Every structure is written in C-alpha cells, then in structure tokens.
C-alpha cells in the first residue's frame, strides 16, 4: 500500500512529512505504518516500517531519540548522535539527516530555517509544551546558525480540543504558568474541561518570535483510518497502539 504523507507549504522545498498510518506492514491493533519501537508490535515489522519512511525521505536511516516528555533538545549531525538519548527534540544543520519524531495524540512539530539550512523536530505533548520544548528547539536552532525571524514551525496531526477532556488539576498546571492560559480551555461535562493542545502549541511558537506558526488541522483522535491515538485506544480498551512518525531533512 502506498504511503500517505501530509506536507505543508511553509516547509517547502525541504523534504518532510507527517506520515499517516497508511502504507505500513503492521497488523492487528497496529495495522499500518507503526514506527514505534516502544510498542509491543513485532520489532522486525516496526523496523520495516521505519525503513519505508527512510526510503521515502531518501536517507539511509532515521535519527530518533528516546522520548520522555521533556524539554531536552539534542544536536544531531548523524543518526547515531540521537540513538538511545533521552530527549524530545532534535536540531540539525547537516544534509541528508532525517529527524524523526513519534506521536499518537501529542504534537509533532517540524521546524525549518531554509535560508540558513537548519532544521528541527520536536515531540510536544502537554507536558513538553508547557515546559518549553518548542522554545528550546528554537534556541538550539539559533545556536546552529538559524535566525529567529526565518524559522517556521508547523504542528502536525494531534488531538484536537473537542477530543481532549482534562480535569481541574490539569487546568491548574497551566494556570500556574500563566493565568491567561484559561483561553485554551473550554467547559466540558461534569466539571471537566476541553484542552486546545494545538492552540496552545501555536501560542508558544508565536511567543518564541519565529517567522510563522501553523497547524495542519488534523485530529488524531477523530480519524482512526489515518492516525493512531493513545486516548482513543484507552477509550476502546485496546491492548496497545501504534505511533505515527513525522520527519524533516535538509
């Protein structure tokens, strides 16, 4: 099956893609392009899926970190620089290195300064976003020669507000950071709230002073044919879930 890849004009002409679950070799609950080695899927099948992504990106291998919901960023010049490192973002100014981020509701964020040949990729769930992983990625890119006013950031498929119910304690964490963050919460049912993760992500990107910030507009929870979703898996009491991959290279 052909791979289904979402791209964004803001990142052109760089090779990049927010890969959907279409076109992979996994089966069962992982059916499709599961790229998560942390899942209980067969390792050899996941490696085959990752090889298909690398081939689509025209690189021999993908650079990916051991994601832990942190704000830590790694500078990568070769895929081996990221292997096994606990972090949630990477930046690079070397050609033909594809940075790969795994998600299943969290925000995959791809960054580029095309003029100065610097790229970045971040895994930004609520905790990473709140703790500044996107801001940290921008700063690391600047350290590699990017200019803030040239950097574009694009948020890929993530869970949307209508599907992201949270409790009062969650709201409190965001209020503690900035009481203006209430604008990213809508009243839900039975004392719950609906959190706008992509809206908050766009806010943090724009506050970082970069050239532009966009979201592709895709909700992982509401489209099981295209996307894996951790929260949907929990609601369905499924055994496990796949991970989507988003990549960018110079």
Stretches found by the model and what they are:
Residues 1-250:
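Active-site microenvironment for binding and transforming phosphate-containing groups
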């Amino acid at each position: 099956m052909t791979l289904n890849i979402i791209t964004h004009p803001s990142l052109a002409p760089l090779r990049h893609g927010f890969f959907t679950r279409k076109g992979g070799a996994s089966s069962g609950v992982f059916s499709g392009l599961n790229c998560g080695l942390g899942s209980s899927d067969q390792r050899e099948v996941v490696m085959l899926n990752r090889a298909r992504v690398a081939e689509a990106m025209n690189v021999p291998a993908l650079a990916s970190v051991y994601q832990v919901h942190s704000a830590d960023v790694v500078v990568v010049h070769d895929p081996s620089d990221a292997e096994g490192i606990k972090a949630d973002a990477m930046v690079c100014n070397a050609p033909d290195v594809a940075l790969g981020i795994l998600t299943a509701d969290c925000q995959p964020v791809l960054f580029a300064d095309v003029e100065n040949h610097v790229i970045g990729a971040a895994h930004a769930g609520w905790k990473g976003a709140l703790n500044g992983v996107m801001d940290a990625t921008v700063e690391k890119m600047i350290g590699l020669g990017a200019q803030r006013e040239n950097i574009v950031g694009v948020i890929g498929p993530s869970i949307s507000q209508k599907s992201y119910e949270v409790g009062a304690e969650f709201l409190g964490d965001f209020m503690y950071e900035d009481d203006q963050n209430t604008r990213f919460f809508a009243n839900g049912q039975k004392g719950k709230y609906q959190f706008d993760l992509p809206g908050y992500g766009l806010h943090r990107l724009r506050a970082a002073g970069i050239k532009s910030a966009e979201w592709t507009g895709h909700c992982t929870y509401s489209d099981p044919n295209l996307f894996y979703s951790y929260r949907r898996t929990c609601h369905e009491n499924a055994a496990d879930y796949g991970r989507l991959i988003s990549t960018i290279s110079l």
